[in-house]
Amino acid sequence: MVYSYSEKKRIRKDFGKRPQVLDIPYLLSIQLDSFKKFTDQDPTGERGFEAAFRSVFPIKSFSGNSELQYVSYKLGEPVFDVKECQIRGVTYSAPLRVKLRMVLYDREAAPGTVKDIKEQEVYMGDIPLMTENGTFVINGTERVIVSQLHRSPGVFFDHDRGKTHSSGKVLYNARIIPYRGSWLDFEFDPKDALFVRIDRRRKLAASIILRALDYSTQDILDLFFDRVNFKIKKDSLVMDLVAERLRGETASYDIKDVEGTIIVEKGRRITARHIRQLEKSNTTELEVPVDYIVGKISGQDYIDPDTGEVLVSANAEMTLEDLAKLSLAGIKEISTLYINELDNGAYMSDTLRIDSTTNRLEALVEIYRMMRPGEPPTKDAAEALFQNLFFSEERYDLSKVGRMKFNRRLGIDDDEGTGILSKEDIVAVMKNIITIRNGNDEVDDIDHLGNRRIRSVGEMAENQFRVGLVRVERAVRERLSLGDLNELMPQDLINAKPISAAVKEFFGSSQLSQFMDQNNPLSEVTHKRRISALGPGGLTRERAGFEVRDVHPTHYGRLCPIETPEGPNIGLINSLASFARTNSYGFLETPYRKVIDGVVTDQVDYLSAIEEGRYVIAQAIVDLDENGRMMDELIACRHKGDSTFMGAADIQYMDVSPQQIISVAASLIPFLEHDDANRALMGANMQRQAVPTLKADKPLVGTGIERTLAVDSGVVVVAKRGGYIDYVDASRIVVKVNESELRPGEAGIDIYNLTKYTRSNQNTCINQRPCCAMGDPVVTGDVLADGPSTDLGDLALGQNMRIAFMPWNGYNFEDSILISERVAQEDRFTTIHIQELSCIARDTKLGSEEITADIPNVGESALSKLDESGIVYIGAEVKGGDILVGKVTPKGETQLTPEEKLLRAIFGEKASDVKDSSLRVPNSVKGTIIDVQVFTRDGVEKDKRAVEIEEMHVRQAKKDLTEEFQILEEGVYGRARNLLLSAGFNEAQLDAIPRSQLLSQSIDDEGKQTELEQLAEQHDELKADFDKKFEVKRRKITQGDDLAPGVLKIVKVYLAVKRTIQPGDKMAGRHGNKGVISKINPVEDMPYDENGNPIDIVLNPLGVPSRMNIGQVLEVHLGAAAKGIGDKIAAMLEEQRELAELRGYIKEVYELGEEVQQRVDIDSFTDDEVVRLAKNLKGGIPTATPAFDGAKEKEIKEMLALAGLPTTGQRKLFDGRTGDEFERQVTVGYMYMLKLNHLVDDKMHARSTGSYSLVTQQPLGGKAQFGGQRFGEMEVWALEAYGAAYTLQEMLTVKSDDVNGRTNMYKNIVDGNHQMQPGMPESFNVLLKEIRSLGINIELDQD
């Protein structure tokens, strides 16, 4: 593999045995592609804005004299960029402008004659835009729209598993689900009649819907039944024989062939052998006794030719009298329905008997009564209702997906078709459910991923937008029908508010629009790749059963079987697998390599769950020879959801990668294959809660996906084009672009501005640091700057800690963790948290609130950190209770008259009229002020601090833009200088020419002169662009802010809190091995090895066997080897060994392992590159052990040997307190530990007295309410069991809800008297009141 200059700084040793056929696709594409489809112009009109507009427009007036047509749309540019929106607390959005055409028709002239056309561009609200990282900024906060997994539109056949009826009989049903519109259900009842429901209302006989579709009884029987024909003879009947139909029946007469030979005797069962004999003898007719027809069902109406009387009606059971009547009337042939108990039931015939309607109108009225009970039905209303239910494009849409699924399920070859139902569709569904009831077809599996599809951001936003348009449509239609249209323009017809409201509601408060989890880069990526079955149109937590939540065979390679939350949402919220993507229909697809005749090709096909069922698919770990031929005779593979073994020739596809089945979070766990699934689930989930540490530390034992994840998450700065680093400082990186990658007429400079100390959604710190130096060469895709939790472009969520598995004086009982003081001293787990505190000055009824340093009844010392405007200084160190922003609120009983207001304004406020409502630091917080922002309403005078901040921002903006301009200008001048040198000028001449005149020189060569003129033009453009950018920036900074009604001023103070690790903090490894720190032990007391190196963390060995997460033990061994090799390299550097020896050792390390795919050609590295690599490997060589394809035990032992460590992975340890050796050897090594965002500082609080609940008068609960510890009923039992009566009495009275008792107690304590007199608990009074409310009078007798 070829490594770039920056990748050579540190190379991860990869133990993967399989070649990388396909790179992991861009991880955020599910979000970005979906939204791009929504906002991009689509000439076909099948998706996005175009589809929404075309589905609603043109809007015609009721009279048809005018219509409003849609022409085109365009999205404008956003006013503020993403960062400005976050600071100002506004939505990052762009205005949508739509060109509409109003056409007026001439009433007097011929129909369709146009009288007038007006075209205008109309504003239709702001549409939130997606940032380049797949998020939305709504009201200043970053949000993610989670994709939804919902039931695909189409037709589904199912049964109730025998749960509905007491007999346990299985009842089948069919359901047609449209994308929008009414659901249509068909279901059998226990008596095998077929019923229909519309929108889950009461059921009707299924034949009613067929009658409403204008089918007669005769038509219905013709559709659903084959016929058996009889000829009437004198004493018998002759039946037309279809031999196959007799199978399984018991002969009620002797069955003879043409020659009269008896084939089946009376009373015998007819078998397949008998049928073959009948077919052989070419018997086409069979004479049967007259009574054979009794009970058969007539297939049509039989009418007396003379009188016109109906002798036998269709669907009537035949009797001997009926036969006699027909014989008398001269009817020679009878047709009956072919019904067979085994595989041709009389279901529709029975249904017709239940049906009380006889014609179409009656059926329509019946449907109208069911849909609109209580309304008198009329013919027109009934017809219109039925038409609108399933046959109107406005009200009903199966969608492209629905039609495809519908047609495929019913065996129709064409995937295309209309979005509405046809008569044939409904009949086909009824025929299919009858086929299933007859046992000739299977029901569907609704948890199959071929029946569930993904609805992503773009599609959901489009649906919401359409909802808004439909609301507008009603209003427009009314306005078109009213008023004088000659005066109106399209602008006057459209009200954009409903559209904005629908879109805003979706992005702001939909269940699927979620506050982004921004703990670390991984949590961001996983949140964007989350797939939820909840939400509008989805499941609900309470009603979702076990089957829906379970892992389904079709999840393979599409949804991760590991990563899902614990708790009520388990299985309902899933994560997209690493390689999965959605197809044009919204179904999940996963890639497979094509296999032809047992040879694996490099062709990769994406298959959906529907297609996958047709193929035989082998795993990625199949042994192949050098030509890609499968070596084993029998190969483990999957076919139709089952695992089986097949020969190489039968295999059609093979997995792309062993990590294909799991999500990115799960594939970050090394040795995942050795962990129990439950613990792996916890491990995947807990990595998302890791807090970015002060100094990121790459994992020594990784999986090789760390780099991909860090780059795709968007937290690191990635080079857009190649070149070299021209300038670098803490806040910006300048890259001079390669000549080959330049666009014509540009300066060839890329400037990357870094994000510094910004607050994330979870109050963690986002900070970018350059990881390149001036002069470094850069290629496209190189990481230029690290973000939070990244180290040289690798994801680094935690720290590599030296751990030992051993008990230590009970301090690691029950998963507790003992850590060394050195960990805290070295700031290994120190994190920075940034809190935003806001102070809002409002306009109240009593006057305006004011932000000032003049606060009543506050001493000088409390104001020491405020400036004269009453706002805290940047850099001030504050603690709980300190004032951050001084604010006074007017208080008073009466409202002020205008005269009083004027007098107050002239003579100043009286102190007594205002109360202190300053913003103070919350009690348990201590930190440093890192930023202050002041937002002032337009028209309100800015205070001194606001003006200072504004000037500072303007200065900063000017400085940034000037530097940017100078860099670009330098690039232009540099190129001009090179051009002039090539045209014959020499260095001395050029030095003599002033820089400003360089571009105006004249050259003889015409081509070069043109090039110079282009550079001069470019310079002028840059200058103009600089002036324009600065003006825009300055205007944005100085303009007033658009604040909420009644708000005059907002001051936001940003407080940085540094948190070191301490007892009570939660830590975890990557294998679900979590625990709480019990003690921070002095370094000298920690166990140490023979070399005197102390252990950092001691874990309990009992946490491993029962939990079966052995991966952590292997990680510790491999970590020890990686660190040991790093130590050896460090020693070589320190001893200044020969470079050849160093190169040889590093080469040996990278070449270790069997069949390892990675090839690192250390020989091709320059000496400098080898030294730089060695320096970066001093702390340990990073290794990659991919899931299901990782390092083997043998390789770990080889690594240990190479590091000069015992291959057992265990060593002698000595007690730090006594110096004694421990009884047996201990597993010691390096484990990657995470500090989780469950910090004791955020959880611990104490209360003596505080607020009480109004009704029960008991203390509130929780830190936010400053509540108490609940003493529940189980704790009461404990005190009862101990017989601690006085303690119990105290708990239930004065410490809880005895109002008088607790007040007296408080007074007594103040007086130094520790007596208590318990009274009546308030909750007893509440109980009395509740009993009285039931109408039972209860009195308390206090004698």
Curated annotation (Swiss-Prot):
PROSITE patterns membership: RNA_POL_BETA
Molecular-function GO terms, alphabetical: DNA binding; DNA-directed RNA polymerase activity; ribonucleoside binding
Gene Ontology cellular component annotations, sorted alphabetically: DNA-directed RNA polymerase complex
Record carries keyword Protease: no
Keyword entries, A-Z: DNA-directed RNA polymerase, Nucleotidyltransferase, Transcription, Transferase
Catalytic activity: RNA(n) + a ribonucleoside 5'-triphosphate = RNA(n+1) + diphosphate
CDD domains xref list: RNA_pol_B_RPB2
EC identifiers of the protein: 2.7.7.6
Protein's GO biological process: DNA-templated transcription
Enzyme superclass (EC): transferase
Subunit structure: The RNAP catalytic core consists of 2 alpha, 1 beta, 1 beta' and 1 omega subunit. When a sigma factor is associated with the core the holoenzyme is formed, which can initiate transcription.
HAMAP family in the record: RNApol_bact_RpoB
Function as written in the Swiss-Prot or TrEMBL entry: DNA-dependent RNA polymerase catalyzes the transcription of DNA into RNA using the four ribonucleoside triphosphates as substrates.
Assigned protein family: Belongs to the RNA polymerase beta chain family.
UniProt name for this protein: DNA-directed RNA polymerase subunit beta
Taxonomic lineage: Bacteria, Pseudomonadati, Pseudomonadota, Gammaproteobacteria, Alteromonadales
